[in-house]
Amino acid sequence: MVSLEEIPLIAIVRIRGRVNVKPEIRRTLEMLHLNRKFWATLVPLTDSYKGMIHRVKDYSTYGEIDGPTLLALLRERGELKMGGSLSDEWLSSNTDFSSIEELAEALLSKRVYLHKLGWIKPYFRLHPPKGGFKRPTKRAWNDGGELGYRGKEINTLIRRMI
């Protein structure tokens, strides 16, 4: 049995659009809160999510997110469900977290999950990457494209999209 600390936190970024997507893939993307192109989400790499990620690998890219990238993502692109952006002041007055750093640490240690927090949107709306994609967006990462598993390289892509 694998402990919760050993399960990595995975960032998934949708790269391809909504046209001509098979219904089962579209539904899986909706369950992952990836309804539009360039939206990102964070999930733990459990068996359930592994199957979902495998199903949407031809429409997204994913990898292990690190602390500084997660912190920048929450600061720049974190949105509240009632409107507005995520801030230290709002967190300290309305939640158990005193800062965005504390929230990022809780997400990385899997004490809380992004989709289970009722006050933050479970996705991040990103820009297209600065400088464009360096590889084709219709081929897998291992074949010289942008799709699928890319490991720690997801952090450089997300930083270019924030």
Curated annotation (Swiss-Prot):
> What GO molecular functions are on record for this protein?
RNA binding; structural constituent of ribosome
- Annotated Gene3D superfamilies: 1.10.15.30, Ribosomal protein L30, ferredoxin-like fold domain
One biological process term in Gene Ontology: translation
Question: Would you tell me the Gene Ontology cellular component terms?
Answer: cytosolic large ribosomal subunit
Q: Which UniProt keywords apply?
A: Ribonucleoprotein, Ribosomal protein
Q: Does the keyword Transport apply?
A: no
Subunit comment for this entry? Part of the 50S ribosomal subunit.
Identify its protein family.
Answer: Belongs to the universal ribosomal protein uL30 family.
What is the name of this protein? Large ribosomal subunit protein uL30
